[in-house]
Amino acid sequence: MLKYFSKHLGQKTFYIFTFLLTTSLFFSLIFSPVKTVASSTLRQVTKNKETKHPTDISFQSAAPNAILMEASTGTILYEKDADKEKPPASVTKIMTLLLIFDALSKKQITLNDTVTVSEHAASMGGSQVFLEPGETQTVDTMIKCIAVSSANDACVAMAEHIYGSEDAFVAKMNARAQALGMKHTHFINCCGLDAEGHYTSARDIALMSRELIIKHPDIFHYTTIWMENITHVTKRGESEFGLSNTNKLLRQYQGATGLKTGSTSKARFCLSATAERNHISLIAVVMACQSAKERVKDCASLLDY
């Protein structure tokens, strides 16, 4: 067809015709509706990526209940049955520590204050540092006993020291939980011993963990202690007692900074783990794991996600 036009139109006219034809084809391609369709598709794909739900991923935690949170923003990166209400064991102590540090920041107490151990506090079973009735320790030492060795007796002693009784302290714990939006939590005691009506969820544990580490980063001075001695001072004299951190993740995961373990026959093995990964602060919570080894493994897997 081009030979026909060249022959009958003349060379100059043919060149003009060819130019106009080429230009027409070029602009028809540029302004084709195909571009609009492609853009719409791209926007939809981008939107889907941005709104992707935390559970729509190939990774699955082995723990029955788990959650991974980015601490600075509270963004949930992963969750699995995170609102299931279960006994948390000594992970309860995160709230206890939060109230202790709140009291410190309000100048209600100081780290050098002397705490006297009551009969009730000394009678606590489970994990303890064997405080005796009438024994005195500083607030600083009591925090170490709670954060490192998960001492029930130290928890009750601090609760009584700040608010006069464990019951009054627990009421403050529940009020604080409500203020934080912890919808699946109710505390009966300050140390985490199994009790009817004492429960929380993986999501709520992450919420109170975030509040503690964001508002009171000094907690890491205690949760990163691996081993340390305290001195018992009683009527019988002085004796050394060794504290050993219950959170083995500290020695098994690079960047681990805390936070709190828990285990009872009902709660099984729980852990709220904090760590720094590539300058990002993370909180990983697992509940109802089958063993202490499994909870560490499960938290490490979450933190690696």
Question: How does the language model describe each region?
Answer:
Residues Q11, Y15-F17, V170, A292:
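Generic alpha-helix initiation/capping and coil-helix boundary signal
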Residues H8, K12, K215-H216:
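Residue-level recognition of alpha-helix termini/interfacial anchor residues
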Residues S28-S39, K266, L302:
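Domain-scale selection of a single, long terminal region
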Residues T36-R203, S209-I214:
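Active-site-adjacent loops and short helices of periplasmic peptidoglycan-processing enzymes
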Residues M182-H186, C190, D194-Y305:
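Domain-terminus/edge residues, biased toward the C-terminal soluble/receptor-binding domains
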